[in-house]
Amino acid sequence: TICRTHVIIYPMTENEPIKTVSDGITFLSTGRYYDGINRWVAHKLKDGDNDAIDYAARQIAKLLPQNAVLVPISGHHGKVEQTMQLARAISSYTHLPIVDALRGIERESQYDAKKKGQTLSAEDMGFYKYKDLPSNRTPYLIDNVVDTGNTAKAAIKALGCGTVASFAMSDTLLQREE
């Protein structure tokens, strides 16, 4: 018996940069969350894996202009943690300044709330501007993954302006904008 297999080759679109605008805020990402290894890398970022941080930083660095200032988005503990590690790694490639300008209240994570079928509001996150930004630079808020965009939107609202740059973006925000 002879078995034949058919191989279908799809064009590679993995890790193509994404740019979308939602509620007047620009979101940039290195690729879709569910493409290739992005989901795995995103989980490793949350674990603080140095190789994942370095990989994500190199990808995000390609998206940023020379006049950017990196602003890590604070996590559910109210302070920057994983996003600061990522911002430092990005800065090591780009030499862009980092300003720890945002704080928030300690809260449940957006990820955990979503698993319960809930979404945190801007008020739940309690973001506020903690430090001033240089006036000659454009703020780029750094996040690991953007899903609904609600966290980033609340952070930008607190800062007053900025663009969001993330490693991966889920289809949730993209489907809202189609």
Question: Where are the language model's segments positioned?
Answer:
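Short, well-ordered alpha-helices that flank and scaffold nucleotide-derived cofactor binding pockets
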Residues: K62, R88, S92, K157-C161
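Short glycine-rich phosphate-binding loop at a beta-alpha junction
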Residues: N67-H76
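Hydrophobic anchor at the start of a short beta-strand
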Residues: A68, P139, C161-V164
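A phosphate-binding catalytic loop at a beta-strand-loop-alpha-helix junction
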Residues: I142-A155
